[in-house]
Amino acid sequence: MGDKDMPTAGMPSLLQSSSESPQSCPEGEDSQSPLQIPQSSPESDDTLYPLQSPQSRSEGEDSSDPLQRPPEGKDSQSPLQIPQSSPEGDDTQSPLQNSQSSPEGKDSLSPLEISQSPPEGEDVQSPLQNPASSFFSSALLSIFQSSPESTQSPFEGFPQSVLQIPVSAASSSTLVSIFQSSPESTQSPFEGFPQSPLQIPVSRSFSSTLLSIFQSSPERTQSTFEGFAQSPLQIPVSPSSSSTLLSLFQSFSERTQSTFEGFAQSSLQIPVSPSFSSTLVSLFQSSPERTQSTFEGFPQSPLQIPVSSSSSSTLLSLFQSSPERTHSTFEGFPQSLLQIPMTSSFSSTLLSIFQSSPESAQSTFEGFPQSPLQIPGSPSFSSTLLSLFQSSPERTHSTFEGFPQSPLQIPMTSSFSSTLLSILQSSPESAQSAFEGFPQSPLQIPVSSSFSYTLLSLFQSSPERTHSTFEGFPQSPLQIPVSSSSSSSTLLSLFQSSPECTQSTFEGFPQSPLQIPQSPPEGENTHSPLQIVPSLPEWEDSLSPHYFPQSPPQGEDSLSPHYFPQSPPQGEDSLSPHYFPQSPQGEDSLSPHYFPQSPPQGEDSMSPLYFPQSPLQGEEFQSSLQSPVSICSSSTPSSLPQSFPESSQSPPEGPVQSPLHSPQSPPEGMHSQSPLQSPESAPEGEDSLSPLQIPQSPLEGEDSLSSLHFPQSPPEWEDSLSPLHFPQFPPQGEDFQSSLQSPVSICSSSTSLSLPQSFPESPQSPPEGPAQSPLQRPVSSFFSYTLASLLQSSHESPQSPPEGPAQSPLQSPVSSFPSSTSSSLSQSSPVSSFPSSTSSSLSKSSPESPLQSPVISFSSSTSLSPFSEESSSPVDEYTSSSDTLLESDSLTDSESLIESEPLFTYTLDEKVDELARFLLLKYQVKQPITKAEMLTNVISRYTGYFPVIFRKAREFIEILFGISLREVDPDDSYVFVNTLDLTSEGCLSDEQGMSQNRLLILILSIIFIKGTYASEEVIWDVLSGIGVRAGREHFAFGEPRELLTKVWVQEHYLEYREVPNSSPPRYEFLWGPRAHSEVIKRKVVEFLAMLKNTVPITFPSSYKDALKDVEERAQAIIDTTDDSTATESASSSVMSPSFSSE
C-alpha cells in the first residue's frame, strides 16, 4: 500500500481479528493510532481533538485528536472541529491523520502508514495512516469489522485508536461500513476504545452513497461495546450528492445481547452540503430483534450533520432505537450532541432524530446529559419531516432517562412547504415507556415566514389506555415562533400525550428548553446550547459541544465540540452545546438554542425556547403558557398542549414552571426561565418562569396564576404562575389563580385553536385545591353566579356544585373575531360547537364540581342556566368586536364607558372577582392588606379603575361573609373587621358565629326570593357559587350541612321539612319562627339592597328589575306596623310569574 492513492473499488480491511498488516514506520514518528491519513501537516496545534483532517501543512504537531482545524490560540476539548484555514502550532495526538505532504521528524509506532507527503515536525502516535484520495468508484471501506462464526473475539484496550478515511469527490456507489460487528453465534466484547475517532470527509458529486458507521448487527451474539471515550465520527459530505445514506452508529442485532458502554466524548460530525437528493442520514440507530442491547456511557458524544441547500428527499434518522422484543438500554450519554444544519431549497426532507420504536422490547434510554441535536434548516423547504426524539415502541418497556442538557436545534427559514416537525414524540402502543431525567434538553426550531402546510408536532405523547405520568418538567419549554404572513395550514401540536395501552412516564426534564429567537440579542450572557453568531467571537468561554467559527477566534477557551459563530459575541459565557447567535452581546442564557432577531439587552434566560420579536420589559413570568396569538394566516390549526389519555391512572403533578412562552419580540433586561417567549413588543426587565408567552402589548405589574395568557400587548413586570394566560387587553397587577384565562383574538379565516385539552376517562384523582383548578372563568363567579342562582327559579336536580372560589373550574373570557374559528379550551370528553362558526368549549371539572361560572352572551338573547347534570360546558360567546379599550393605555374611571362596553365591563368584573378572592386569602391568614399590594398583585394596568373595583370587592365580601375593610393609617393599609352582630337576637357573638350569621342571612334571602320556601338543591346550588359545599369544612362558616339541617333548625331560624309525595325523598327550607323578627327582616332587606348594588353591569336589566322588585316588597313588609300581618302578606304577595315556587 505505500504512499500511493487507494485503488478504485478497493476494500481495505483494517484491524480485523487474527490479521495484522504493519508497515514500515516513517522517520521520527511516534504513533499509537491504528489509522492515520493526514492530508496536510498542521503546525504546532495543541489540541485533544480525536479527529483531525487539516488541509494545510502543520509543523511540530502532537495530536491526540483525529479531526481538527483549530483556530489560533484556542484551547478546546471538543471532539470534533473542522477549521477552514490552516492552524499553526498544532500539537495533536490524533490517531488518524491524512496529510498530502511528507511529515518530517516523525516518531511512529504505527504498523500501517500511507501518507502522500511527510509532515514536518509532527509527533504522532497513530499506528495506521491511510489516505484515500479522490475518484473512488464502488469502494467498500469495511473497517474494524468482526464477523467470525462460533468465535470468541475480544477487542480490548485500543486507546487512541483512530480511523480516518477521507473520501474525495466523484465517488459513485460508495459503501463506508465502519466499526461494524456482525458475528453469528459469537461472544465478541468491544472494550476500551478511548479517543477512537472516525473521520470520513466525503466530497462532491456522490451518487447512491451508503455511510454505515458503527453498526452492530450480530445474530445470536453477545456483543459488548464498552469504553469508547472521545471516539468521534466525522463525515463531511459536500454538495451535489444524490441518494446518500448516512447510517451511523446503528445496532441491528437479532436475538443478541449487545451492550454499548462507555463512549465518552464520542462525537459524530457529518456536514452535508447543498444539492442533495434522497439523502438518508440514520444516526445512532438501534434496531435489534429479540436482543438485549445496552447503550451506556456516551459522555460528550456529539453528532454534527450540517446539510446545506438544495437537498431533496432527505431523511435524517438520528439516534433511533427500534428493536423488536429487545431489552435495549441507552445510558450515560452526557454531552452527546447531534448537529445537522440544513440550508435552503430542501424538498421532502425527513429528520427523524432520537427515535425509539421497538416492538415487544424493553428499551431503556438513560444518562444522556448535554446531548444536543442541532439541525438548522434554511429557506425553501418542501415536504420536510422533522421527527425528533420520537419514541414509538409497541408492547415495549422503553425508559428514557438522564438526558441533561440535550438540546435539539432545527432553525428553518422561510418558504417552507408541507413541513412536518414531529419532535420529542412518544406514541408507543402497549408499552411501558418512561422518559426520565432530561434536564436542559432543548429543542430549537425557528420557523420563519411564508410557511405552507407546516406541522409542528412537538413533545407529543399520545397514549390510549395508558398510565401516563408527566413529572418534573421544570423549565421544559418549547418555543416555536411562527413569523409573519403567508402561513397556510399550520398545525402547532405541542406537548401532546396520546399513547395507546401504554405506561408512559415522563420524569425529570428540568431546564429542557426549546428556544428559537429570530433576532440578535444584545448584552446577553447565555448558557444556551445552540447559538450561531455571524462573526468572530472574542474571548468566549464556551462549554457548548459544537463550535465552528468561520474565522479564528482569539483567546478562546472552548470545551464545546462544535461552534459556528458568525459574529463576535463579547463577554459571552456559554455552557450550551450549540451556540449560533447572530450578534448577541453579554448574553447569559441557560437555554440550549437561541436565535433572536433583535437584541435583548441584559437578558438572563433559563428558558429553552425564546422567540422574541421585540424587547419585553420588566416582566416576570411563571405562567406555563402566556401567548397572545395573533396569526394572520389561512387554514391554520393550532393545537396546544393536549392530553388525550383514556383510563389514565395519574394526572400531571404539581404546577410545573410553565411549558410554553413565545414572545414575538426580543426582551430587554429579561431574566427568563420560561421555555417559550414570543412577544411582539418589548417587555422590559422580565423575569419569566412561564413556558409560552405571546403577548401583543405590554402588561404592567401583572401577577398571574392563570394557566393560559395571550395578551395582545406586551406585559410589563408580570409575575405569572399560570400555565395558560390569554388576556386580550393588558391587566395591571393581576393575580391569576385560574388555570385558563384567555381571550383569544385570532385574525384568520378557518383557524382552529385548540388549547390545553384533557380528555381522560375514569381519572383516578381529580384536581384539588385552589392552585390546581384547571379552568377559572371569572364571570364574577362569586356574586354573579350567586345572584344568577338567587334570581332564577329553583331547579329539580342540580349536581353538587363546585367547591370554593379558588376551585372554580372555568374562568376564561374568550373573544374570537375570525370567521370559522374553533377555540377548544381544556375540554373533557364533550365538545360543544356554537353558531357563527365559532366553537369555544371550556372544560368541565370533576363530577362533583361541574360548573362554577354563569354563561353570559352579549348577543340579543341571554341564557343563564342552572347547570344541571345534563348541562354542557359553559360557553362564553362574544359578538362585540370593540376591543380597543382592552389595549388602551389611557384608562379612566367612567361608569358610562363601562355601561357602553360589555366586554370591557366583563374584564372589570373579573378584576372584582380576583380582588375578592385575594382579600379572602389575606383574611384567612390574618394579615392586613395595603393598596400597593392590591395594585401590584391584582389591579395591574387598571389603576384608573381601582376605586370601582375595590368598592365592589369589599362590598361583596361584606355581603356574603360579613367581613369589612377599615383603613387604619394614611398609607392605605386596611384591616378586616366583622360587621354582622345579631347578639340581641340570641345569635353567636364570636368570630365564627358572626360569619355564620351572614350565611344565615344569605339563606333566608334565598328563601325570601323564592317565595315561602326553597328546595335543598337550590340552596346548595347557590352556596356552591361562593365555595360553600355540603360535607366540606369552610374557612369562615365551618361545616355548612350541620348548620343548615341541625343547628339553625334547633335554634328555630330555619325549618327543614320533607317535600310531600316525593320519591326519592326531597327536602326544602322555610323561615323559622325566630326569622320573622324585625331585626332579621331588616338584615335581609339590607342584604338584598347591597346585593343589588353589586350586580354586574353585564347582567340584563330584567334581573336587576326583578331584584329591585323583591327589595321593594321586603321594604313594604318592614314598614308595615303589624309584624304578623306583614309576614302573612309577604308570604302571599311576594310570588311573581318569573319566580314561581316549586
Swiss-Prot record:
Where in this chain does the record put each MAGE domain? 908-1106
Q: So which residues are the signal peptide here?
A: none
What keywords are assigned to this protein?
Answer: Cytoplasm, Phosphoprotein, Repeat, Tumor antigen
Give the subcellular location: Cytoplasm
Q: Which GO terms describe its biological process?
A: negative regulation of transcription by RNA polymerase II
- Per the record, residues carrying Phosphoserine are 63, 207, 382, 1063
Q: Found in which tissues?
A: Expressed in testis and in tumors of a wide variety of histologic types.
Biased composition regions of type Polar residues, renumbered to the chain: 92-103, 614-626, 671-680
List the residue ranges forming a coiled coil, or say none.
Answer: none
Task: Answer yes or no on keyword Lipid biosynthesis.
Answer: no
Give the region (Disordered) as residue ranges. Answer: 1-132, 502-778, 791-893, 1118-1142
The protein's matches in Gene3D superfamilies, at most eight in alphabetical order, are given as:
MAGE homology domain, winged helix WH1 motif, MAGE homology domain, winged helix WH2 motif
Low complexity bias locations: 13-42, 76-87, 627-659, 741-762, 807-889, 1123-1142
Please name the PROSITE patterns in this protein's record. MAGE
Q: Does the keyword Phosphoprotein apply?
A: yes
GO cellular component: a single term: nucleus
By its UniProt entry, which Pfam families does this protein fall under?
MAGE
Q: Which PANTHER family match?
A: MELANOMA-ASSOCIATED ANTIGEN C1, MELANOMA-ASSOCIATED ANTIGEN MAGE ANTIGEN
Protein name as annotated: Melanoma-associated antigen C1
